[in-house]
């Protein structure tokens, strides 16, 4: 299933909207992040998987493709954890995708069942600029 959520990225002193597209399909394993993510964004996979597993949610046996657009904009930091996780939950039909329409997310997930979301440096600039 395909789902779209939104995030933000810092560009100089401004922020830009980032579209987070999540597609989950059978027949394959792993999470694939595309769209110029830095190493902290790539590490989102590990934080998201740990939070899901610790909350009893399973992603195993599924191929998850996450596209961060626009592809030419560098995405940095852990603030993409929350929009990716919410997109995955919606693609798994655990969250109603229609209720996410036009909503922007930012936050770093804790490993403790996903019950903690940390404030990120991106929250205020994104709120002001986008």
Spell out what each predicted region is.
Residues 1-122, 127:
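Peripheral, non-AAA+ core regions of ATP-driven protein-machinery
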Residues 130:
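Gly/Pro- and small hydrophobic-enriched strand-loop and loop-to-helix capping segments
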């Amino acid at each position: 299933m395909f789902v779209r959520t939104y995030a933000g990225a810092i560009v100089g002193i401004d922020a830009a909207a980032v579209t987070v597209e999540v597609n989950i399909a059978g027949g394959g394993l792993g999470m694939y992040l595309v769209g110029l993510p830095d190493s902290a964004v790539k590490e989102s996979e590990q934080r998201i998987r740990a939070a899901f597993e610790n909350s009893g949610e399973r992603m195993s046996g599924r191929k998850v493709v996450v596209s961060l657009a626009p592809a030419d904009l560098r995405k940095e930091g852990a603030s993409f954890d929350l929009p990716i996780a919410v997109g995955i939950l919606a693609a798994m039909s655990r969250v109603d995708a229609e209720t996410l329409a036009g909503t922007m997310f930012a936050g770093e997930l804790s490993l403790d069942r996903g019950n903690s979301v940390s404030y990120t440096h991106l929250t205020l600039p994104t709120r002001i600029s986008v």
